[in-house]
Amino acid sequence: MEKGKEYLMTGLLLVACLAAPQAYVVEGSGIRECLLYHFTHENVFHLILNFMFLLRYKPLWRSTLFGWITASIAAYMPICAMDLPTCGLSGICYAMIARSNAYQKRISWIAVLSNIPMALVGVFNWRLHLMSYLISFISWTVYLRVRNS
């Protein structure tokens, strides 16, 4: 694959993060916030951490689009609501990891168990990360089984 194509989605996500209106997910958030919160970051460090993953992962458009949809659905679920506002690309990143894991027919226990320290700290929306991962993994597993049968 060409180098330019490998980094295209990462570049487009960076532009979206810089250009999109500020949006946060809190309890009772509407569809608009659930669709846009991914592009808001708490600070530059938060943005850099997400993009370090993306630069390594080099997502393609299908992974990115499905990750965005999956993380947006997870954000709309009441179980993922927190008192603190949620923002960032992490839900999309977890959904993209799940897509790769579904193709490999295995669960990434590192991705799943990484939520334990986040739950203990209390300022990270670990439920959103976990739901994004699970929804994406289950969806892709079902899709792949239907496609291959």
Predicted regions and their residues:
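A detector for small-residue-rich transmembrane helices and their helix-helix packing motifs
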Residues: 1-149
